[in-house]
Amino acid sequence: MIKTESIDFHSYLPPYRSLLTPNARYDYKTHTLVPIKEHDLRALTSMNLGGKHTTTSKIKMKYKSLLSDVSKRTSILSLRIGSTANAKQTPIGVKSLPSEVLEYIFELVDSEEAYINCMLVCKQFYQVSKPFLYEDLSFTSTYRFAQFITYLRVNPEVGQYIKSVDLSQIKHGEPDDYEDENRELEQTHTSTSHGDSDTLNSVSRILAGWRDWKYKNNPLYSIQPYLNLTKVNSNSQTSSKSSKTTNSMKMLRLSKTLSYFKPKKRQKLNSSRNKNRAHPPLQTLNLGNRRNNSHPQINKFLMNYSASKDLPIGYILHLISLCPNIISLNLGNLSLSTDYEISRSMMYKFRTFDLMDNYPKETAATINGIMNHNNKSNEESLFGFNQEKNSFTSLSILNINDAKSQQLQQSRQNPTSSASSVYSVAFSKPIVKYNSLLPPLPPAIHDLSYMNKGDGKVYLSDLNLKSMNNNYLTKLSENEILHAIAKAHSSSDGPYGNRLKYINLSSMIWLTKTSAQRFLDQIVNKCLWEESYFSDAETVNSDSDSEIIGQDLVIDLRDSGMYKNLEWAKLIDLNQSEGRRLIKRIINDDVLNTFDEFMRRERLRRGRIGENYLN
């Protein structure tokens, strides 16, 4: 017989009494009746009918008391999650984006004005937009280029952002219609009486050059631009008129002084002054004028250089050495001026004459504080008080073999070793209040830091001096630029520079055939030419390819030299076989004109006398 187990339905189903009494609810977990008051019942019914969620904490606590500990924890967590979800979430802004996303967004902008405006927004935008702003540079003024070279020497980290520089568009300071205006003024000078004032107004339109930046702080040169003088006539009529005007001016002054003694006018003046003080005039601040700095005018003592657009050789050498990641260098149609390099042993004597003093001393510290992510305080970075961090980092990087530098490094590692030492006081963190009480640093420290500033070289164009002792100077030639390009961008890994892709040396009058051969020989590795072979019958424009591997480099030598249409002054594209053959012929001095090349082909085609007959 199959025995059936008895099932207790009361343990699973609610009692019948709970269905009849609306003031009670049955809990299926504890199998007990939960009494509910009328006030709580009305709240539950209103919630079930679609009303607002107005349940109180008392109803929830009645049900929670009947549950186990685990259920209590889960219910508490659910309440916390619900409260946080209902809270207002902060909106996600641009600053919360990762740096990679911001760099991609700024890369799509491609606008110089937009990058300049972004640098004024916040510190994060400044750090992201600065590399894009300095990536592609082109100059039209020698004054602005001189300022930029000095800024590179003050802050060499900017040179890592530069990839393209264009100096082919540099112009002189005179306006385009300056010559026509001078001719018209010369013609009308004899007939009109305002000739001198017109000429001075036209002179004031001439823009400043790099020499104005060089002699900016030189006391021998006036800082003021050309003065607007007035013409003086020696006629008797004008003198009588001037005497009458002076007498009338004296009478007006006396009348004004007497008017102050009248009480009525005094009250009016006082009331008008009080009104002006109570209600000052409204002024609007235009942030757009912050960077609209007009170009300075030429100095009156440098008018002889108004039509020149030359640049010193030292500036170009600074540009090449301080920009290691440059890809495109355009020096086409650029005129160079002579320059001199100051000897290393006498460089420290001219520290006070350097053009880096044209900028404020806190410029480098401010820029480093903005670009540094791990700076301790904004006060130190903005005002340049972090002397331990900014001023002496070059000593540890450059590994100077000097006893004084070793003492500096030892004192930096143990700043509290000797309290009486000058170095321990100098390397301690200064206080703004007692900054003037600190002892001055010894001159050897300033000399070492100055000699290692930038690329470690100082030229005569970097000083606000016109001349000095010839024993301290070594003259620079134009070939130093070619040697600097080949030295900075050639590497042992490959035959060419890893980054340099375009060099424009077109319309260079000083460039000769021998200098071009040396420059191309330094850039191109000779190992490439040993296994290659060019026959005499093969021309530059022939279709047969050689074993030379093409490189991504273009060198423009067109219209260079003292004559036009020279055989070696051509565009050399090493991506093509024609350019690779041409560069080999230039190095081997085997470039011929069209007539000589035709005669060579004819001689090879006909052969020697009797050779074809015997064959």
From Swiss-Prot:
Residues 91-137 form the F-box domain. Residues 172-198, 264-291 are annotated as: Disordered. Disulfide bonds: none annotated. The keyword Oxidoreductase does not apply. Keywords: Ubl conjugation pathway. Residues 264-278 have a biased composition (Basic residues). It comes from the Eukaryota. The keyword Ribosomal protein does not apply. InterPro entries: F-box-like_dom_sf, F-box_dom. F-box protein probably involved in ubiquitin conjugation pathway. This is F-box protein COS111.
